[in-house]
């Protein structure tokens, strides 16, 4: 697969730091961010690269040449083959694509030259190949979805809506944001070449929403643009600390698996109405701390109300949108939500017989945790299962996780759990931020 890197922008928001450097040449721990991008591509077998340049183009072209030389910073070979397209006039972030389409004969990876990423590109490419479509977006949750563009998708990851910052949005929504990495088909570039500047998102990709030809690939991996001095400083620290590299799914991850009812939200029995969903005190702060400490936050919840015919999948999705929205308002996010819709007991009015089965996903069965572990390359022995019931503890035990039982009142039962805490907030403060959280990192 060929990679196209858009490196022609002026970087006006970060001009005070960049000075006479094009933004892709800003150093991250001693190496230009563009060099780090090329290194990540090379390590994963992507060695055919086309870079579009414009503002201060010679600084990029003289540093990297055709890719056959060595880095002036490290002395190591670049190890890639580089071609260039020079914008004679600003063409927006996609105008150059139409002018290089004769060099693109298969689906290609499209990157921004000022974005720091550390992701498993092979997983991304495999998803795109399996699902087809004209374009796949790399999407992830963030700590400020309320002022970010949002991607809405169906259960097959087909994008149904693309909500820009300016668009009206629903009261509740999934925390899914376009990260700025794409895999595109050259078929998108057929037809007349547009005049002037072309906006990739608004003119090319957003119109595909709802057609079935635009997919989104959800991942917790590190992708961050460095378009402001504050973001640039944060990226530098994330690279120096190892946080960026640790999130790559080629490396083993550690997770906190979370029950939902009674752990995240107030327990009301069978939760059937979205208005009954209410975050427990301290939960948003706890999940935010899980995010900050580098653990994946994964919800695994039994929802027999589906099998009972009392809640539809669409209604459950709305409840989970509310959960993500409330967490997002406090700067917290979930990396994934898994639910089991089944229940083994049959013979009740209104039930859905096809879901009244014995399954491998209903806790204490391990199915949801195993699915998450495969998807995110999770080391279960380094992870925690946290919940307020026996089935939560047993599910964790069944996959080799450490377990924590939440018990706000009375004496907690002894179920073999490693820790007991009054709330999720207390668990995070006592365990993840303490010695036990450190020893398995």
Describe the residue ranges of each PLM region.
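Catalytic-core segments of class I nucleotidyltransferases/pyrophosphorylases
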Residues: 108-109, 116, 122-129, 140-145, ...
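A short, conserved beta-strand element in the Rossmann-like catalytic core
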Residues: 91, 115-118, 223, 263, ...
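Active-site neighborhood of HAD-like aspartate-dependent phosphohydrolases
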Residues: 253-297
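Acidic, Mg2+-coordinating phosphoryl-transfer loop and its flanking beta/alpha structural elements
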Residues: 384-421
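Conserved Lys-Pro-Asp/Glu-containing loop-to-beta segment of HAD-superfamily phosphomonoesterases
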Residues: 109, 352-354, 360-390
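Substrate-recognition element of Asp-dependent hydrolases with the DxDx(T/V) motif
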Residues: 52, 283, 287-323, 330-347, ...
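Conserved N-terminal catalytic core of the sugar/cofactor nucleotidyltransferase
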Residues: 2-5, 27, 31-113, 121-123, ...
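N-terminal nucleotide-binding beta1-loop-alpha1 segment
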Residues: 1-19, 44, 251-261
């Amino acid at each position: 697969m060929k990679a196209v890197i858009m490196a022609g922008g002026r970087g006006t928001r970060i001009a005070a730091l960049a000075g006479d450097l094009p933004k892709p040449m800003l150093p991250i721990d001693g190496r230009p961010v563009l060099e780090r991008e090329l290194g990540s591509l090379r390590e994963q077998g992507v060695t055919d690269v086309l870079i579009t340049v414009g503002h201060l183009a010679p600084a990029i072209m003289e540093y990297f040449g055709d890719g056959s030389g060595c880095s002036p910073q490290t002395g190591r070979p670049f190890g890639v083959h580089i071609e260039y397209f020079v914008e004679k006039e600003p063409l927006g972030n996609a105008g150059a694509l139409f002018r290089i389409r004769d060099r693109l004969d298969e689906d290609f990876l499209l990157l921004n030259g000022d974005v720091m990423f550390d992701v498993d590109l092979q997983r991304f490419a495999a998803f795109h190949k399996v699902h087809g479509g004209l374009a796949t977006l790399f999407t992830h949750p963030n700590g400020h979805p309320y002022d970010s563009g949002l991607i809405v998708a169906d259960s097959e990851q087909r994008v149904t809506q693309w909500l820009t910052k300016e668009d009206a949005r629903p009261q509740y929504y999934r925390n899914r944001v376009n990260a700025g990495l794409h895999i595109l088909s050259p078929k998108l570039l057929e037809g007349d070449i547009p005049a002037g500047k072309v906006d990739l998102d608004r003119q090319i990709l957003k119109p595909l929403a709802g057609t079935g030809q635009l997919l989104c690939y959800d991942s917790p991996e590190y992708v961050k643009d460095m378009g402001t001095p504050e973001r640039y400083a944060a990226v530098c620290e994330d690279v120096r600390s190892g946080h960026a590299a640790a999130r790559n799914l080629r490396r083993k991850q550690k997770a906190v698996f979370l029950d939902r009812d009674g752990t995240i939200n107030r327990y009301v029995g069978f939760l059937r109405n979205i208005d009954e969903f209410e975050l427990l005190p301290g939960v948003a702060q706890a999940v935010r701390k899980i995010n900050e400490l580098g653990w994946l936050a994964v919800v695994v919840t039994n929802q027999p109300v589906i099998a009972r015919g009392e809640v539809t999948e669409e209604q459950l999705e709305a409840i989970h949108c509310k959960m993500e929205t409330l967490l997002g308002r406090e700067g917290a996010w979930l990396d994934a939500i898994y639910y089991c819709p089944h229940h083994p007991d049959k013979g009740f009015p209104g039930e859905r017989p096809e879901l009244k089965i014995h399954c491998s996903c209903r806790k204490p069965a391990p199915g949801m945790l195993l699915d998450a572990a495969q998807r995110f390359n999770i080391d279960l022995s380094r992870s925690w299962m946290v919940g307020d019931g026996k089935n939560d503890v047993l599910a964790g035990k069944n996959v080799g996780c450490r377990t924590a039982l939440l018990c706000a009142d009375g004496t907690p039962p002894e179920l073999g759990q490693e820790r007991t805490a009054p709330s999720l907030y207390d668990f995070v403060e006592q365990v993840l931020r303490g010695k036990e959280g450190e020893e398995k990192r």
